[in-house]
Amino acid sequence: MKAYFYDNLPGDQRLPHDSGKEVTVAELEKVGVLYFRFPDVEGVNTLAAERGYKNRDEIIVSPEKMGAIYETKVRQFFDEHLHEDEEIRYIRDGAGYFDVRNEGDEWIRIKLVKDDLIILPAGIYHRFTTDDTNYIQAMRLFKEEPKWTPLNRTEGLDENPYRQEYVTQFLKAQAEQA
């Protein structure tokens, strides 16, 4: 895993866009993002039991697997959105980027590779893309039945109760500590 501020320069979303300003695991935790590295599935199973993740599936995002819809799907994943559930991904192969917003509404880019596991809290604005290899295989973990319902960032979404809870728990807490 490598985390840094996104450079916001134009160009292919699958390129690194590395500003050169590193972000630590502790800084990720301040915005509610949890990172783990598990060389085998046993560690994932233990975490799943501890956190109540009852269901899982696997997804491969690649042109070979997805065919003609690949480019459309990758652009869709890159639309800024939030979920009303935690988003948990364990990378089985390949690589990709999760971008998350910090308390200053800046993008933090998180590159994940094989054996990395990330947990994004409900209500965090984020987006995803593969890297320039155009391939990632990930295990998705869920507390309940598998679902992936993105709520794209629009005017008024900040009033969503899951967004409000996220802001209170993480962003306002940071502002009060500053």
From Swiss-Prot:
Q: Does the keyword Ribonucleoprotein apply?
A: no
Entry's transmembrane regions: none
Q: Give the cofactor binding note.
A: Binds either 1 Fe or Ni cation per monomer. Iron-binding promotes an acireductone dioxygenase reaction producing 2-keto-4-methylthiobutyrate, while nickel-binding promotes an acireductone dioxygenase reaction producing 3-(methylsulfanyl)propanoate.
Q: In which pathway does it act?
A: Amino-acid biosynthesis; L-methionine biosynthesis via salvage pathway; L-methionine from S-methyl-5-thio-alpha-D-ribose 1-phosphate: step 5/6
The entry marks the following residues as binding Ni(2+), namely 81, 83, 87, 126
Residue ranges of coiled coil: none
Q: Name one GO molecular function term.
A: acireductone dioxygenase (Ni2+-requiring) activity
| Its biological purpose | Catalyzes 2 different reactions between oxygen and the acireductone 1,2-dihydroxy-3-keto-5-methylthiopentene (DHK-MTPene) depending upon the metal bound in the active site. Fe-containing acireductone dioxygenase (Fe-ARD) produces formate and 2-keto-4-methylthiobutyrate (KMTB), the alpha-ketoacid precursor of methionine in the methionine recycle pathway. Ni-containing acireductone dioxygenase (Ni-ARD) produces methylthiopropionate, carbon monoxide and formate, and does not lie on the methionine recycle pathway.
Designated name of the protein: Acireductone dioxygenase
Taxonomic lineage from the root? Eukaryota, Fungi, Dikarya, Ascomycota, Pezizomycotina
